[in-house]
C-alpha cells in the first residue's frame, strides 16, 4: 500500500523529522510511506491569506499522485478513532488505493481543494502546530496498520 502525506511547510524542527522517520520505518514492507513538503506561499506585502492558499493549492494539486484517494486534514472534518482509521486503511489496502493525506498551510486550504477530497478528517478538536500534526498523523497511520496486523502496539 502507498501512503503519501503532503504537508505545506518546510524547515521543521529536528524532533519532528526524527519522529516522523521513526514511525515511517516501523511500517515495514507493507506500506510505502512518503512525506513531501510543499513550499508555503509567503504572506505580507500584497499577498493575503486567500491568495496564499490559492498558490499553495496549485502546488498541492501538482504533487498529488495521479489517481490517489485524497484525504484532507481540516478542523471541520470527522475525527475517527484509531480503530476506525484502521478500518479505512484496510479498505484502502483491499482496493489497492494510493492514499494521499494533505496537511494545509498556516491559513488552511481552499474550499475547492477540500471539495476534491474523498474524506475530510481531523486529528483533534485542539489547534495543533503543523509539525505535531505530521508526527500525530504518521503515528496514527502506524497504529492503524498495527491494529490490522494484531500487533501489541495498540491496546484497547
From Swiss-Prot:
Subcellular localization(s) per the UniProt record: Cytoplasm
The organism's place on the tree of life at top rank: Bacteria
CDD domains according to UniProt: RlmH-like
Pfam family, one: SPOUT_MTase
Binding site for S-adenosyl-L-methionine: 73, 104, 123-128
Gene Ontology cellular-component annotations: cytoplasm
Reactions listed under catalytic activity: pseudouridine(1915) in 23S rRNA + S-adenosyl-L-methionine = N(3)-methylpseudouridine(1915) in 23S rRNA + S-adenosyl-L-homocysteine + H(+)
InterPro entries: Alpha/beta_knot_MTases, RlmH-like, tRNA_m1G_MTases_N
Segments forming a coiled coil: none
Main enzyme class: transferase
NCBIfam families assigned: PRK00103.1-4 (NF000986)
Homology family: Belongs to the RNA methyltransferase RlmH family.
Function description: Specifically methylates the pseudouridine at position 1915 (m3Psi1915) in 23S rRNA.
Official protein name in the record: Ribosomal RNA large subunit methyltransferase H
Source organism: Neisseria meningitidis serogroup C (strain 053442)
Gene: rlmH
Amino acid at each position: 500500500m502507498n501512503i503519501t502525506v503532503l504537508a505545506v511547510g518546510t524547515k521543521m524542527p529536528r524532533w519532528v523529522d526524527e519522529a516522523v522517520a521513526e514511525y515511517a520505518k516501523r511500517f515495514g514492507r507493507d506500506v510505502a510511506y512518503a512525506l513531501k513538503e510543499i513550499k508555503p506561499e509567503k504572506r505580507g506585502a500584497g499577498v493575503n491569506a486567500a491568495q496564499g492558499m490559492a498558490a499553495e493549492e496549485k502546488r498541492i494539486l501538482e504533487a498529488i499522485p495521479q489517481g490517489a484517494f485524497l484525504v484532507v486534514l481540516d478542523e471541520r472534518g470527522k475525527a475517527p478513532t484509531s480503530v476506525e482509521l484502521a478500518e479505512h486503511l484496510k479498505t484502502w489496502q483491499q482496493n489497492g488505493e494510493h492514499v494521499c493525506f494533505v496537511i494545509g498551510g498556516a491559513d488552511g486550504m481552499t474550499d475547492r481543494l477540500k471539495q476534491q477530497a474523498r474524506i475530510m478528517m481531523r486529528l483533534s478538536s485542539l489547534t495543533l502546530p503543523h509539525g505535531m500534526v505530521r508526527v500525530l498523523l504518521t503515528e496514527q497511520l502506524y497504529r492503524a496498520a498495527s491494529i490490522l496486523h494484531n500487533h501489541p502496539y495498540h491496546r484497547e
